[in-house]
Amino acid sequence: MKKKQQQHPGGGTDPWPHGAPVGGAPPCLGSCKRRIPLLPFLRFSLRDYGFCMATLLVFCLGSLFYQLSGGPPRFLLDLRQYLGNSTYLDDHGPPPSKVLPFPSQVVYNRVGKCGSRTVVLLLRILSEKHGFNLVTSDIHNKTRLTKNEQMELIKNISTAEQPYLFTRHVHFLNFSRFGGDQPVYINIIRDPVSRFLSNYFFRRFGDWRGEQNHMIRTPSMRQEERYLDINECILENYPECSNPRLFYIIPYFCGQHPRCREPGEWALERAKLNVNENFLLVGILEELEDVLLLLERFLPHYFKGVLSIYKDPEHRKLGNMTVTVRKTVPSPEAVQILYQRMRYEYEFYHYVREQFHLLKRKLGLKSRVSGPPVRPQFFIPTPLETEEPIDDEEQDDEKWLEDIYKR
């Protein structure tokens, strides 16, 4: 019986019913009508390329819109590229030398009792030395502003002669919200309990600048209030030693929104976000020399030579005059209560401290502190009040700085 020949898919019989001969493709019989379809692949590649380019364009436009709508200042973006996103353990050494752009608008919205008078003294010397415009304010006890006050202050700052460095005790201002160019922010904070104790005794007894300094600063304070024992103030829950007065550092970074003055997660997270997006550097007072070193590294047009000035014996002598006098340490029970009431302040402080140390490691600087920070144990926190805070009574009279500088 004859076997049926296999039918070829294109019609007719298949000349190789058992497969094509070994050793290559079969010769073309008759006219070859089958071709390899290259064009569809080419068309697919062009479509894919066009899709990628369109996506890139949308991303670029979105980035531009973000920048115009209040994104981080260009200098901070360049700095992040300079430092990279890897951790120190992923690096093999300090980053290669590179020239960073020069920001011409810097704001130091200094936190009270965090070394600001020392830094202002240094800035006065540096502004004369390097020729930048140091802009200060005669208002020292108004940190929260109305919308109109924000607009007026931003207008005054933005029209200052550049390059400028503006400094004042004021909560974070969003320049972009009012159509201004967002400046680069810098600041310094310290351990919250240490800051509170320094301010508590400074308001009552001043510092080494003069015996009557505190009388000028708080003339209306009654004697019983001036000599109020710190433990009684804390344990008896006096307004000065409880919330919202203790919720002090975070609003400087959270901003002017009313919720920024309410102790809680919302203000804390917003403060962290602003630190990441708008602050070039937030240092800690406990490591002031490293803070000055980083400022000199990032802002040489403002801070070049600041460390040598700070270490100068004459400056040390003047700096010692700003040390608060008559400070006493509260009892352990009182300190633990302060920890409980300042839980959000401590969470923010430790976050800033860790970011500061990470930045130092990326630049190859060894931390001067040994071991990890000891975090306070809050146990069961007491309820945090959210009433309107009392205005900051710290009036930073800077006339003495001018008198010292003229010597």
Curated annotation (Swiss-Prot):
One of its GO terms (molecular function) is chondroitin 2-sulfotransferase activity. Residues 386-400 have a biased composition (Acidic residues). The gene is Ust. This is Uronyl 2-sulfotransferase. The active site is at H169. It is a single-pass type II membrane protein. Keywords: Glycoprotein, Golgi apparatus, Membrane, Signal-anchor, Transferase, Transmembrane, Transmembrane helix. Residues 1-49 are cytoplasmic. Belongs to the sulfotransferase 3 family. Coiled coil: none annotated. GO terms for biological process: dermatan sulfate proteoglycan biosynthetic process; establishment of cell polarity; regulation of axonogenesis. Residues 1-20, 386-407 are annotated as: Disordered. Its main location: Golgi. It is found in: Golgi apparatus membrane. The lineage of its organism: Eukaryota, Metazoa, Chordata, Craniata, Vertebrata. Signal peptide: none annotated. One of its GO terms (cellular component) is Golgi membrane. The chain crosses the membrane at residues 50-70. Residues 71-407 are lumenal. Sulfotransferase that catalyzes the transfer of sulfate to the position 2 of uronyl residues in glycosaminoglycan chains. Has mainly activity toward iduronyl residues in dermatan sulfate, and weaker activity toward glucuronyl residues of chondroitin sulfate. Has no activity toward desulfated N-resulfated heparin. InterPro entries: Heparan_SO4_2-O-STrfase (IPR007734), P-loop_NTPase (IPR027417), Sulfotransferase (IPR005331). Its EC number is 2.8.2.-. It holds the Pfam family Sulfotransfer_2. Glycans are attached at N85, N141, N156, N174, N320.
